[in-house]
Amino acid sequence: MDEGVNLVFHKKVIDGTAIKRLISRLIDHFGMAHTSHILDQVKTLGFQQATATSISLGIDDLLTIPSKGWLVQDAEQQSLSLEKHHHYGNVHAVEKLRQSIEVWYATSEYLRQEMNPNFRMTDPFNPVHIMSFSGARGNASQVHQLVGMRGLMSDPQGQMIDLPIQSNLREGLSLTEYIISCYGARKGVVDTAVRTSDAGYLTRRLVEVVQHIVVRRTDCGTLRGISVSPRRMPERIFIQTLIGRVLADDIYIGSRCIAIRNQDIGIGLVNRFITFRIQPISIRTPFTCRSTSWICRLCYGRSPTHGDLVELGEAVGIIAGQSIGEPGTQLTLRTFHTGGVFTGGTAEHVRAPSNGKIKFNFNEALVHPARTRHGHPALLCSMDLDVTIESEDILHNLTIPPKSFLLVQNNQYVESEQVIAEICAGTSTFHFKERVRKHIYSDSEGEMHWSTDVYHAPEFTYSNVHLLPKTSHLWILSGGSCRSRGAPFSLHKDQDQMNPRSTERERRYLSSLSANNDQIRYKFFSSSFSGKKKDDRSPGYSEMNRIICTLHCNLIYPSILRENSDLLAKRRRNRLVIPVQSSQEREKELIPHSGISIELPINGIFRKKSILAFFDDPRYRTKSSGITQYETMGMHSIVKKEGLVDYRGINEFKPKYQMTIDRFFFIPEEVHILPESSSIMVRNNSLIGVDTRIALNTRSRAGGLVRVERKKRGIALQIFSGTIHFPGETDKISWDSGILIPPGTGKINSKESKKWKNGIYVQRITPTKKKHFVLFRPVVTYEIADGLNLARLFPPDLCQEKDNMQLQIVNYIVYGNGKPIREISDTSIQLVRTWFILNWDQDKKSASAEAAHASFVEVRAKGLIRDFLRIDLVKSPILDPRKRNDPSGSGLISDNVSDHTNINPFYSKPKMKQSPRQNHGTIRTLLNQNKECPSLMILSASNCFRMGPFNDVKSQNVIKESIKKDAIIQIRNSIGPLGTALQVVNFDSFYYFITHNQVLLTKYLQVENLKQTFQVLQYYLMDESGRIYNPDPRSNIVLNSFNLSWYFLPHNNYENSCEEISTIVSLGQFICENGCIAKNGPYLRSGQVLIVQLDSVVIRSAKPYLATPGATVHGHYGEILYDGDTVVTFLYEKSRSGDITQGLPKVEQVLEVRSVDSISVNLEKRVENWNEHITRILGFPWGFLIGAELTIVQSRISLVNKIQKVYRSQGVQIHNRHIEIIVRQITSKVLVSEDGMSNVFLPRELIGLLRAERTGRALEESICYKAFLLGITRTSLNTQSFISEASFQETARVLAKAALRGRIDWLKGLKENVVIGGMIPVGTGFKGLVHCSKQHKSIPKNKHFFEGEIRDILFHHRELFDSCISKNFHDTPEQSFRVFNDS
């Protein structure tokens, strides 16, 4: 080395950065030749030392870290606990995922940090250890995978796989770990192949954009500069930014000038700036250069090759393009080695310095409760919070920064190194943040419920998306379902029993059904007597076939039973027993059908004056369309609403039109609804005959007058039969719509009246304004009988009205007066229907508390099975507020039935250990938004379980006593805002039927058993104000009653336990798993309380999903969700793996200006605001220019920061000036706006900013334009050279356009000259081709009036301009990255 210089002796390890600094200083001191000689000596020394010893690498050198075992065990324990909390509904899926990732990432990082000290202590000369930190080959990450753990892997999309690989490569991987590992390895291989080509193409585009940028002048004469402040950035970045630049202004310390304008900045000057803390420093950059087609030496600065100002003729554009593109190519190759291992970051924690009590100012203005990112309860600090920890002998003071989470309570005892706060992650820990949507899918079928914390109104009209104002639970109440494929009817009626395993069979039935199938045979439930063993079945007891019909008729009254009706149709004071028969059996036995259809309400409860059955008289049927007409009549509702519940679903008799006359008239007409596209072959108001073709595939059935009318959904074509009468002048017709003339009211001598014996319907037709005629249409008269003979239809015993319960008959017309009736596909239309109304006398004592309950009774005798519909008068606990909470009244056995007749299986010893049968449940109707296509829901026994023992029969007395004491809590008050409450009583119970009636035993029948199904009393929805909503009667969702859990309470003291339980559990309440209900331990499943009985609680199992504010809920309240449906969507920020494979597309995205959500939106707002306000202040000529200038400056700074962020995160250093040259080109155009029309430019034409400015000055008129960001591809196709554009892309189009416009190419760039074969205007060819214009030098300075004016207006006021421009410039990467969110 040079011996004349005294060099300082250093003894420390130097890395790549230190080598760079050394070379830089050597060049400054000794020049290029000496420096290369010195570096040769360093190289020789390095190789000599490296080859002095031979290091071999064996598998035994891979030493596993000893602490790995317990670290992994601890992480697994945390993951298990997290899984439990998620299952209980304490944390939601995103919080679980986030915490799981951070637990494993922290474990992996800790192992990696342990690796180095472990090697240093146990084996400092371990070859793996020496190699991993040499920097030659391999890095700490790869060694960590060999001897630590592979940790979390990324999938090919860069997303995280949340199952970590716990093994390392030394130990070997399990099969699952190997497959996950292959994901990451494949990602590395694919990235290497694909991204290399991407990086090459990126380089090509970059070079296309800037190939014509050459250093052509020494000084462009600009007065502008960009401010850089040492306070706003780390010192390292500050030095990188300044070195090699040229000052735009003189720099003073006090009155002393330490650096002058146009002086280039070296390391010495930078150190002085840092020492004196001068700010701000104004520097020249490519952004400030006055031309877009070239650059001057002073705006570019030093050449990176020889450390002096750049030479004239240097092709700096191509150097810039290569500098940005090349690291992309190089870095893609680097991904292969780490093989897709995820590298992210975790939040920083504040730990307690010692044991002691923590104290802080618990003020609502300073801290308020919140949830951390992991779902833990915490206190959020809104500003700096001073925390004191008092130990025995010392006080520790800590300051928690704002937006941090405090994880401890005030006055809590903390241990040393306990985490007391979590600092908001968003500083330097995370590499990339992006906003991600996470959809949570339902893993079971069920019904959606939520609390009042969810907005019940959807976000938009007709949408099913609801927003959450605060953290709350969503519940999926379990139950299977069978979807009907568009079938508008259900096979099952409410409360029917069903076998869930027959769902598939039912789907096949539904798909093959048509609307014409009147009766459908279906095996509805299989009956077996539960009281006996399965082997010991009754002889000959077969499955019962229940026939369900698609229309109203559930059951048909058989007429064979009339002869022995006195025996089989018994009726006591409060009960009707009516024999029923299915239509299929009737067809088998060839019995004439009496026509009565019995109709059951949805919930099985008849209120007073409810409809029991209806009778369709065949005399009142028609097959044609038409209008019903009758004289004015009194219309009034028979039933008034009473009680609490709005019984929409219970078919009360609320006839629209109650008959008070004895006849009505039907005016027939023929109607065709045709689509708009169909061609009609007849004209409006024309006369046609029978079987005339009126459309392509349609013929008329009757002749008459044609009327064509356009409707919303098509064309209505009506054919009116009758005769046409042209009135004379004497005839005055004042009606337009039509008048009905009943028979006997016309003139006796008139010929027409003889034709129309039944009456006529006169209608005036006006085809034109002056012409009109009258149409006489025939009328059909229907006489209505006084009433049907009940004795002919029902046993006479039922019709006597001396006792309480009775039947009444009411006729009513189905269609209103003048209402049009449309036939549907040749089905007959019933005009009059006869209703049988169930009525009874009310006692004064029980004013409105009585209801009738219908239940099916199947009686099997020797060789004979009969179904009976039994209607009991019971006191309904729902209708009577006093009785609503009383379990005794909610039983379906009426009060006068003796105890020895029915034995409840809950208390019977032989049935103690039997579980509910797997294949049974009841069907219930649920709320459904879509009325046309109902869905069916089944609850099965697989989801229910029970706890605790059954109780003895003795306990019945205790129950009766405790009922009197009113121990159960008020149901309605306790439901509160919890949404739906279901009240179910004794579902699917099997009863012995023991009778002491000697007549039945000896004379006629032996009743072997009677199976009675007890039904759900009422299914209702209750909102937060306590009002009750009824389910929609038209929707048929089927619920089996068996997704239920029995929870039996401790049976030592019923009254006390009942009072205790009632304070904890209320009907409709949701219970999370592991919550305590009673003293005998925690409850094991989540669910909703369905029945509260004195000794047990029945719970319908449910799955809770926690949702936090900002989440969106899909689906409506009460909607049925299927397996795999989206329940809720979370929007959250997550860190992406810090790979250049994510970085390279990001660079490309920024350069192609595709990141809509981050840059463009912000810029558009800024452009609009600037243009609007500055134009208003300064007037037109300057407003657009300054608005566009400032916007462009802002966007340039943001783009530079964003690109630098990506490369710096990979440890790649690119000088800002290279990026600035590229960014200058993509931001140099403005878009001519359409509102300010100009004579020079076309609307939406892209022109250079300088050109727009000069043209505006020359023409002295305002040109309206705004800043516009072009991507690098579009910039390449918008240059001044069509030859360059055509050689890049779209050759034919570019050349054709250029020919049409007559474009001239001045061959100023490199590429054009290469294509033509001329001299390239750079380097040595520069001086021969380009001469400096003498004219430019001769322009006096005062001619720059435009620049002077601008400077006076805005730029000279340094404070204002700095505040606009320098806020974001060279900001810390994290801050600028937060401003422009990742797309």
Curated annotation (Swiss-Prot):
Cofactor note as given: Binds 1 Zn(2+) ion per subunit.
Entry-linked InterPro entries: DNA-dir_RpoC2_beta_pp, RNA_pol_beta''_euk, RNA_pol_Rpb1_3_sf, RNA_pol_Rpb1_4, RNA_pol_Rpb1_5, Rpb1_funnel_sf
Keyword field: Chloroplast, DNA-directed RNA polymerase, Metal-binding, Nucleotidyltransferase, Plastid, Transcription, Transferase, Zinc
One GO cellular component term: mitochondrion
Cofactor(s) the protein needs: Zn(2+)
Pfam families associated with the record: RNA_pol_Rpb1_4, RNA_pol_Rpb1_5
GO biological process, one term: DNA-templated transcription
Keyword Metal-binding recorded: yes
Amino acids binding Zn(2+): C220, C289, C296, C299
Free-text function comment from the UniProt entry: DNA-dependent RNA polymerase catalyzes the transcription of DNA into RNA using the four ribonucleoside triphosphates as substrates.
Protein family per UniProt: Belongs to the RNA polymerase beta' chain family. RpoC2 subfamily.
NCBIfam families found in the cross-reference section: rpoC2_cyan
Quaternary structure and partners: In plastids the minimal PEP RNA polymerase catalytic core is composed of four subunits: alpha, beta, beta', and beta''. When a (nuclear-encoded) sigma factor is associated with the core the holoenzyme is formed, which can initiate transcription.
Name recorded for this polypeptide: DNA-directed RNA polymerase subunit beta''
Organism, as annotated: Oenothera biennis (German evening primrose)
Source taxonomy: Eukaryota, Viridiplantae, Streptophyta, Embryophyta, Tracheophyta
